C-alpha cells in the first residue's frame, strides 16, 4: 500500500508531479468558485434615476426595500432588461402597451408601469425607449439607464428594486412570450399566493418535443438537457423550466429575494428559485406561448460554462454560509 502511494505521488506529467499540481488546481478553483468576491456595487453614482419627460427633471427611483406597500396604487410593474435591443424591443413594447392599456380600460383597478433597464447598451436602445416615453404618460414608462453592463440578472434585480407595483412581471425584451399570457399567469398567482408570497413561472417545458426544439442544433439540445439535470441535482427541485424569461412575483416575494441576489448573469433565475424554495415561497409553473426570436445574445457554449460555474457558486456558497439566506 505504501509503495502504491509512493508510485502515485511520484507520477508526473511532462515532469510535473501530479498530486501537487492537482492540489494547486483544486485551491485555485475553490477560491474562484467559492471565495472570490466578484460582485459589482448595486448603484454607480447617479445611476438609479429617471427623467420625467413632462417636467424635464431628473428624479430618483423609489425603493422596493423601503416601501412594503405598492406606490401610487400601481398594480403591475413590468420589468424589461435590454442590452442592444433597438431592433427587437419595439415589437415587444407595442404588444405589451396594447395589452396593458386594453386591460386598464376593462378593469379600472388595474394600473401599470413599465421599467426598461438599458444594461449598458452600445446601440440606440435608450433613445428608442425615450421616444416611447414621450408618447405615453410619463408615469407609465420609465428608463433605468445603467452605466455599465451588469448582465441580465443584474439588470432585472435593479429594475425590480425600483418597482412600485403590487406585482412584478419580468419579461424578455425580444417578446418571445406572448404578453396576453399574463392573464393566465395572474390567475395562477391568485390561486397559490399565501401571506403575500408567490412566484409563477412561465414554462416552455411543453415544447420539448415540438419542432421548435427539434430544429435546434444537436449541441444546443445536449447543453439544454445537461443544464436541466445539473440544476435539478444541485439547486432547484421540481421546476421543469427555470430559464423562461416570463415570471411573476408578489411585491413581498421580490422584497425578500432580490435585495440579496448575487448572480448577475444568465443563471440568476436559478438563484431566485433556489432561495424561494429555501424560504418556502409558493411556486407554480404555467405553460406559455413562446417563439424563438432571432438576434439572441446567448452563445450556447460559453454561456453554458458561465452558468455551470454560477450554479456551483449558488449551491456551495449558500451551503458554506458565504452567502446568507435572509428570511
Curated annotation (Swiss-Prot):
Main location group: endoplasmic reticulum
Pfam family, one: Glycos_transf_2
Pathway membership, UniProt: Protein modification; protein glycosylation
Keyword Transferase included in the entry's annotation: yes
Compartments reported by the entry: Endoplasmic reticulum membrane
Membrane-spanning parts: 16-36
Sorted UniProt keywords: Endoplasmic reticulum, Glycosyltransferase, Membrane, Signal-anchor, Transferase, Transmembrane, Transmembrane helix
Induction: Regulated by srfA.
Highest taxon in the source lineage: Eukaryota
Single biological process term from Gene Ontology: protein N-linked glycosylation
Reaction(s) the record says it catalyses: a di-trans,poly-cis-dolichyl phosphate + UDP-alpha-D-glucose = a di-trans,poly-cis-dolichyl beta-D-glucosyl phosphate + UDP
GO molecular function, one term: dolichyl-phosphate beta-glucosyltransferase activity
Residues in compartment: Lumenal: 1-15
Enzyme Commission number: 2.4.1.117
Cellular component, GO, one term: endoplasmic reticulum membrane
Topology in the lipid bilayer: Single-pass membrane protein
Gene3D superfamilies: Spore Coat Polysaccharide Biosynthesis Protein SpsA, Chain A (3.90.550.10)
Residues in compartment: Cytoplasmic: 37-327
Function: Endoplasmic reticulum membrane-bound UDP-glucose:dolichyl-phosphate glucosyltransferase involved in protein N-linked glycosylation.
Family of this protein: Belongs to the glycosyltransferase 2 family.
Name used for this protein in its record: Dolichyl-phosphate beta-glucosyltransferase
Organism of provenance: Dictyostelium discoideum
Organism lineage string: Eukaryota, Amoebozoa, Evosea, Eumycetozoa, Dictyostelia
Amino acid at each position: 500500500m505504501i509503495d502504491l502511494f509512493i508510485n502515485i505521488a511520484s507520477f508526473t506529467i511532462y515532469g510535473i508531479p501530479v498530486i501537487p499540481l492537482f492540489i494547486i488546481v483544486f485551491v485555485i478553483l475553490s477560491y474562484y468558485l467559492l471565495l472570490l468576491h466578484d460582485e459589482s456595487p448595486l448603484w454607480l453614482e447617479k445611476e438609479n434615476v429617471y427623467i420625467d419627460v413632462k417636467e424635464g427633471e431628473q428624479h430618483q427611483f423609489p425603493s422596493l426595500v423601503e416601501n412594503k406597500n405598492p406606490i401610487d396604487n400601481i398594480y403591475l410593474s413590468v420589468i424589461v432588461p435590454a442590452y442592444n435591443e433597438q431592433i427587437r424591443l419595439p415589437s415587444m413594447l407595442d404588444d405589451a402597451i396594447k395589452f396593458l392599456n386594453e386591460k386598464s380600460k376593462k378593469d379600472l383597478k388595474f394600473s401599470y408601469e413599465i421599467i426598461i433597464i438599458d444594461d449598458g447598451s452600445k446601440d440606440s436602445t435608450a433613445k428608442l425607449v425615450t421616444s416611447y416615453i414621450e408618447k405615453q404618460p410619463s408615469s407609465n414608462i420609465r428608463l433605468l439607464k445603467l452605466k455599465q453592463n451588469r448582465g441580465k440578472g443584474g439588470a432585472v434585480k435593479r429594475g425590480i428594486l425600483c418597482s412600485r407595483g403590487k406585482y412584478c412581471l419580468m419579461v424578455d425584451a425580444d417578446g418571445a412570450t406572448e404578453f396576453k399570457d399574463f392573464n393566465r399567469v395572474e390567475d395562477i398567482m391568485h390561486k397559490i399566493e399565501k401571506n403575500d408570497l408567490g412566484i409563477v413561472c412561465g414554462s416552455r417545458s411543453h415544447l420539448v418535443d415540438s419542432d421548435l426544439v427539434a430544429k435546434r442544433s444537436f449541441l444546443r439540445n445536449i447543453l439544454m438537457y445537461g443544464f436541466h439535470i445539473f440544476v435539478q441535482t444541485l439547486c432547484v427541485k421540481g421546476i421543469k423550466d427555470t430559464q423562461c424569461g416570463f415570471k411573476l412575483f408578489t411585491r413581498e416575494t421580490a422584497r425578500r429575494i432580490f435585495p440579496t441576489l448575487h448572480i448577475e448573469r444568465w443563471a440568476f433565475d436559478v438563484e431566485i428559485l433556489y432561495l424561494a424554495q429555501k424560504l418556502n415561497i409558493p411556486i407554480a409553473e404555467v405553460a406559455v406561448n413562446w417563439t424563438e426570436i432571432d438576434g439572441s445574445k446567448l452563445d450556447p457554449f460559453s454561456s453554458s460554462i458561465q452558468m455551470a460555474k454560477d450554479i456551483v457558486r449558488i449551491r456551495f456558497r449558500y451551503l458554506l454560509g458565504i452567502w446568507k439566506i435572509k428570511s
